[in-house]
C-alpha cells in the first residue's frame, strides 16, 4: 500500500529532517542543473550590483530536485532575509498580507506548492508582485472600504511540481522561470560523495556510484539512501562504504539495481502476469493493487514511464520490452494495434 513510506519516494518524508545538513549553502556548491545555475548566478549578480530586488523566480520540476534548496541559496547569495511558506498554508488573503507586510526591502518570500493557492489569495498576490502594493477590502457591506498598503520591494520565489495548474496571470508575473530536470548518475555520484564527507563517513567511488544509480535521478532520494546505507556500514563496523556494502544494504531495503522498489515491481508484475503485458486501464490496476487511482498516476507511474518500462496509450497501460527484461519474464506476442493512437479510451 502507498500509505507505507517508500524509500524511493521523491516526496519529503518525516525522517528527511537529516538531509538539511547535506544541502549546499552556495550556488558554487550546488551540483547539477548547470544552465539554470549559471543563469541564476548572472541574475543574482546583476540585482546585487544594482542594489535592486531580484525579479520574481518560479522553480518548476518534480519533487526532490532542489527547489527549496535553491530558493534558500538565492536569498543567501543576495544577502537578504528569507521567509518560507506553502500554498495550502495561506488559507486567506489576511494570511498573505501578514507575510508580505513583514518583509524588509529585497527580502525573499518562498511559496512552495504555489499552484495550490486559492483564487482569492492569488487576486491579492497579483498587485503585490507587480506594483508592490496590497489592495485589501476592510469591513463588509455598505461599510466596506478599499485600503491600499505599500510594500517593500521583495522577491517572490515560487515552486511547483505541476506548472499546468498555475493560472496564466500568476505564471506571467514571474520574470525568471527555471525548470529543473532529473540528475545524471555522474551528478548524483558527486552529491553522494559530498554527503558522505559532510556525514564524516568513508565512501569509495564504486560505493557512491551504486547509490547514485539507484537514486532515480533525485538528490533527495540519494541523500535518504546514503543515510540508510551508512547505518548498514556502521552496524558492520566497515571503515567505508564500498559497492558490496551499498549493494547489500539497498538489496535489504528492496531497492533494486534500477532504483525500483517492491511497489514498482508489484505494479509491473501484475500487468505482466495478470494482463499479458497490457493494455490495461488504470481503474483496473487500481482495483487489482487496492490503490487509489491518483496514487498510481502520481506516485507509481511517473518514474516507470520516465525509465521506459511503461507506456500510457489510449487503450490503457502497456509494458515495454525493457520492463519484461528487467523482470526476467518472456514478452508475449501482442497485436501491434495495441500501440496505436485509436481504438478506445483509457479507463
Swiss-Prot record:
Pfam families per UniProt: AAA_lid_4, RuvB_C, RuvB_N
Keyword ATP-binding in record: yes
Positions contributing to Mg(2+) binding: 68
Positions contributing to ATP binding: 22-23, 64, 67-69, 130-132, 173, 183, 220
Domain notes: Has 3 domains, the large (RuvB-L) and small ATPase (RuvB-S) domains and the C-terminal head (RuvB-H) domain. The head domain binds DNA, while the ATPase domains jointly bind ATP, ADP or are empty depending on the state of the subunit in the translocation cycle. During a single DNA translocation step the structure of each domain remains the same, but their relative positions change.
HAMAP family tied to this protein: DNA_HJ_migration_RuvB (MF_00016)
Full protein name: Holliday junction branch migration complex subunit RuvB
Gene name as annotated: ruvB
